[in-house]
Design a protein with these regions (language model features):
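Actinobacteria-biased recognition of intrinsically disordered, low-complexity terminal regions
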Residues: 1-27, 238-275
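Alpha-helical membrane-embedded segments
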Residues: 135-151
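Cytosolic juxtamembrane helix at the C-terminal end of the final transmembrane segment
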Residues: 150-165
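A membrane-cytosol interface segment of integral membrane proteins
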Residues: 160, 198-263
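Alpha-helical transmembrane segments and their membrane-interface junctions
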Residues: 110-135
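Membrane-helix interface and helix-disruption motif detector
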Residues: 49-59, 125-133
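Phosphoinositide-dependent membrane-docking surfaces
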Residues: 168-170, 175-194
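N-terminal membrane-targeting/pre-transmembrane regions
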Residues: 1-39, 52-117
Length: 275
């Protein structure tokens, strides 16, 4: 099941507060500013560290790299969200949303950062008694175990959402997926730690689905689940030639989503090359 696997992004970077979908959408802009500020602030600190002690520099470098990766990830996410309509397509299986390869790479980049610098720390731990080296050596072991655990069963997946007349299939970047029939009345209203909390009929606990680098807003996802779990007529359209048009109509942002500070699709006239 989806909730058995942790996000690629470190859990300690994600707020434990439970918020609404609207709050989560508007919060993406704030998170970008925070990570961009952290990346800018880390540059002079790294310069001072390398002048003071190379070992201290080695300890701080992953932190600066982490802020930079997350800032770039969110900036690129905004770009792809504006072009969100083009990410959905009709296939023989149903209506599919695929994540661009660039976002997949950025989603995996933290592991590359941890493993590369932690490997240097492990070498430092063997060659000296410095505390930073020991710390990074432990981080190397933990990162290696986490990477193997995430991708042991499958390779990174581009397809994240599949909508059919029977239900919706949600897939993580790790390739682990879960199918939710419309008969289970899936719904979502809250977000916790970057994960959308999905409620289903007959299930006590919520299913968690990561939204951090998914180019769809939480309110769009909420509307998708609510509409097709309630409307039989719209579900029937998913099995016909107008399946893609039906899904895009449901996902079309509201005027509130266009006007507030959240990221969403560009207005139709803009996405089609208009003014």
């Amino acid at each position: 099941m989806l909730e058995e696997y942790e996000l690629i992004w470190p859990s300690w970077l994600r707020s434990r507060r439970i918020g609404t979908c609207a709050e989560a959408d508007r919060g993406r802009r704030k998170n970008t500013m925070i990570f961009s500020g952290g990346a800018a602030l880390s540059s002079p600190l790294l310069l001072l560290a390398v002048l003071e002690d190379p070992v201290i520099f080695l300890a701080y470098l992953p932190l600066g790299g982490m802020f930079t990766i997350y800032a770039v990830s969110l900036i690129r996410l905004r770009h792809y969200m504006r072009a969100g309509r083009s990410l959905w397509s009709a296939t023989e299986s149903g209506v599919v949303m695929e994540v661009p390869r660039e976002l997949m790479i950025l989603d995996l980049a933290p592991w590359v950062l941890y493993l590369s610098f932690a490997f240097s720390g492990a070498f430092e731990m063997i060659c000296s008694d410095y505390l930073p080296g020991s710390f990074l050596g432990v981080a190397f072991v933990l990162s290696s175990v986490g990477a193997v655990r995430c991708f042991w069963r499958s390779l990174p997946a581009r397809e994240r959402i599949l909508v059919t007349g029977e239900g919706v299939r949600l897939t993580r970047i790790t390739g682990q997926s879960s199918f939710i029939p419309w008969s289970q009345k899936p719904s979502a209203s809250h977000v916790n730690g970057g994960d959308l909390l999905i409620n289903t009929k007959g299930r006590v606990d919520e299913m968690r689905f990561p939204m951090s680098l998914l180019p769809v807003s939480c309110r769009q996802f909420q509307r998708l689940l609510d509409t097709f779990s309630r409307s039989v007529s719209k579900r029937h359209r998913l099995d016909g030639p107008y399946a893609l048009r039906t899904v895009l109509d449901v996902l079309e942002p509201t005027e509130e989503e266009y006007s507030d500070s959240s990221w969403t699709w560009a207005r139709p006239e803009v996405s089609q090359g208009g003014a």
